[in-house]
């Protein structure tokens, strides 16, 4: 199970940071820089908002979680950290949160709020050249493993949101 988590994390990080900045032609007009900041502290407020929202629904989400921790501290360390983080965030945004609406219909407002905030962080991270990475070869295998878990994977994923937020924060700080 741990190797699946580490592999999943590795894939996420590789994919997550795959964005690169396109070359822009030189112009004589000064254009205001609208790119997001790339410093970890630029994400602190949004991460705190995620934690506050999760804290309100944590008992409900963790009530049915009888699995061991998937997102251990090694997932964002090392050369695969960017791929793992990318895969994890995409997985949460594309699969876990949408499935959570069906598994926990009474928590739709909170889940939508957390998803929206996480989408904002993810979008900014993808646009930050300092957070880019390349190799995406492991992503497919990890995605297939996660898909086999179905609703149990959704429950597990939502119950570990606080751990995801911690790993995201660790990752952002490691890229200074």
UniProtKB/Swiss-Prot annotation:
One of its GO terms (molecular function) is cytokine activity. GO terms for cellular component: extracellular space. Residues 1-25 form the signal peptide. Its main location: secreted. InterPro entries: 4_helix_cytokine-like_core, IL-10/19/20/24/26, IL-10_add_hlx, IL-10_CS. Glycans are attached at residue 152. It holds the Pfam family IL10. SMART domains: IL10. Keywords: Cytokine, Disulfide bond, Evasion of host immunity by viral interleukin-like protein, Glycoprotein, Host-virus interaction, Inhibition of host innate immune response by virus, Inhibition of host interferon signaling pathway by virus, Interferon antiviral system evasion, Modulation of host dendritic cell activity by virus, Secreted, Signal, Viral immunoevasion. It is found in: Secreted. One of its GO terms (biological process) is immune response. Disulfide bonds join 38-128, 82-133. Homodimer; disulfide-linked. Functional viral IL-10 homolog. Can bind to the human IL-10 receptor and compete with human IL-10 for binding sites. Requires both subunits of the human IL-10 receptor complex to induce signal transduction events and biological activities. IL-10 signaling pathway has several immunosuppressive activities that are exploited by the virus. Inhibits TLR-induced type I interferon production in host plasmacytoid dendritic cells. Belongs to the IL-10 family. This is Viral interleukin-10 homolog. It comes from Human cytomegalovirus (strain Merlin).
């Amino acid at each position: 199970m741990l190797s699946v988590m580490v592999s999943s994390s590795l894939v996420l990080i590789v994919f997550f940071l795959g964005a690169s900045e396109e070359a822009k032609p030189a112009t004589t007009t000064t254009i205001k820089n609208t790119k997001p900041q790339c410093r970890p502290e630029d994400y602190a407020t949004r991460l705190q908002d995620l934690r506050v929202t999760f804290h309100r629904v944590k008992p409900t989400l963790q009530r049915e979680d009888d699995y061991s921790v998937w997102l251990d501290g090694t997932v964002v360390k090392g050369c695969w950290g960017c791929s793992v983080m990318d895969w994890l965030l995409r997985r949460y945004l594309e699969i876990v949160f949408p499935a959570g609406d069906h598994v926990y219909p009474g928590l739709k407002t909170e889940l939508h709020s957390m998803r929206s905030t996480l989408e904002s962080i993810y979008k900014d991270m993808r646009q930050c050249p300092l957070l880019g990475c390349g190799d995406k070869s492991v992503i497919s295998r990890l995605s297939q493993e996660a898909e086999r878990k179905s609703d149990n994977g959704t429950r597990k994923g939502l119950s570990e949101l606080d751990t995801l937020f911690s790993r995201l924060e660790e990752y952002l700080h490691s890229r200074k």
